[in-house]
């Protein structure tokens, strides 16, 4: 069975659409969902990632959820390998794999079988040390001198990606973008659905989502994860919501002041997601508010299948 991918910005309703599609197909064929949200890989990071509780998954098997401890570093290469194995096993069982998420590099690495450039622990460690010495803003400036395009595409607060870009530039002698995947026929002939809303409507949804996260106990979740090493986690501690709560707690606050910067950071991230996904001509875009999205999604999938 060829897969279906449902991608797009945060807060657009991708998980709900995937479950609706799964229910519609359930009478005729099995369906299993493969997560493509990097932060939902982490055990215990539930509220801040809007991870669906098991009771709300409608009996549909889910993969690539809760596979990492918060002290482990998330890796696109690891995800690509493990998720591809999941997809091929699901298809071999005669079921439909539905890939769901909005983590840009994770989605594209999976669908385009991205071959990753070499890595060198010594070079990586040297740039990590440089980051610790000069700070993320200064290191972003250094990246801008050697690879302006990479600096323009990476947030000046994203130390992990800045370090990786500098590592790749040093090891390959080429711009970071030279290692990016080309956009050709998607792996496994996957049908790709993009879900989005008009900007002002999505902003309202994001505000409500952020309020709900704090009301449901995001601060308490962060406090609990601190006992499991969240602060030492290279990627987990930088996740939206979690990083902002940590910063407020470190400043002596009770975490509640993190609500606004979390919302602002999420809106900024949505702009990056749109810019990334909209350049992909293979995506069939749907309006999140349309009542016939299940039918349109299935038509697109059947046209491929």
Swiss-Prot record:
Swiss-Prot/TrEMBL catalytic activity: adenosine(37) in tRNA + dimethylallyl diphosphate = N(6)-dimethylallyladenosine(37) in tRNA + diphosphate
InterPro entries reported for this sequence: Dimethylallyltransferase, IPT, P-loop_NTPase
Cofactor(s) required for function per UniProt: Mg(2+)
Keywords annotated in UniProt: ATP-binding, Magnesium, Nucleotide-binding, Transferase, tRNA processing
GO biological process per UniProt: tRNA modification
A GO molecular function held by the record: tRNA dimethylallyltransferase activity
Translocase in keyword set: no
Paired cysteines (S-S): none
Binding-site positions, ATP: 8-15
Function: Catalyzes the transfer of a dimethylallyl group onto the adenine at position 37 in tRNAs that read codons beginning with uridine, leading to the formation of N6-(dimethylallyl)adenosine (i(6)A).
Name the record gives this protein: tRNA dimethylallyltransferase
Chain's gene name: miaA
């Amino acid at each position: 069975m060829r897969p279906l991918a449902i991608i797009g910005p945060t807060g657009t309703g991708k998980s709900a659409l995937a479950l609706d599609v799964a229910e519609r197909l359930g009478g005729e064929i099995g369906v299993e969902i493969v997560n493509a949200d990097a932060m939902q890989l982490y055990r215990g990071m539930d509220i801040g990632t809007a991870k669906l509780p098991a009771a709300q998954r409608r009996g549909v098997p889910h993969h690539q959820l809760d596979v990492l401890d918060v002290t482990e570093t998330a890796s696109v290469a690891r995800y690509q390998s493990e998720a591809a194995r999941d997809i091929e096993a699901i298809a071999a069982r005669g079921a439909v794999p539905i890939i769901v998420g909005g983590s840009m590099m994770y989605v594209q690495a999976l669908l385009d079988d991205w071959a990753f450039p070499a890595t060198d622990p010594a070079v990586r460690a040297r740039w990590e040390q440089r980051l610790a010495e000069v700070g993320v803003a200064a290191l972003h400036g250094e990246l801008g001198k050697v690879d302006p395009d990479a600096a323009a595409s990476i947030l000046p607060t994203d130390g992990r990606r800045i370090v990786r870009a500098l590592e790749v530039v040093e090891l390959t002698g080429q711009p970071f973008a030279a290692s990016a995947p080309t956009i050709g026929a998607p792996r496994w002939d996957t049908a790709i659905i993009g879900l989005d809303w008009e900007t002002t409507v999505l902003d309202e949804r994001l505000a409500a989502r952020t309020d709900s996260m704090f009301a449901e106990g995001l601060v308490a979740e962060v406090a609990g994860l601190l006992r499991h090493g969240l602060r030492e986690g290279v990627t987990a501690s930088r996740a939206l919501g979690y990083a902002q709560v940590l910063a407020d707690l470190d400043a002596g606050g009770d975490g509640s002041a993190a609500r606004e910067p979390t919302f602002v950071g999420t809106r900024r991230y949505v702009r990056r997601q749109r810019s990334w996904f909209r350049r992909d001509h293979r995506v069939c875009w749907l309006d999140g508010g349309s009542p016939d999205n299940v039918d349109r999604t299935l038509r697109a999938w059947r046209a491929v299948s």
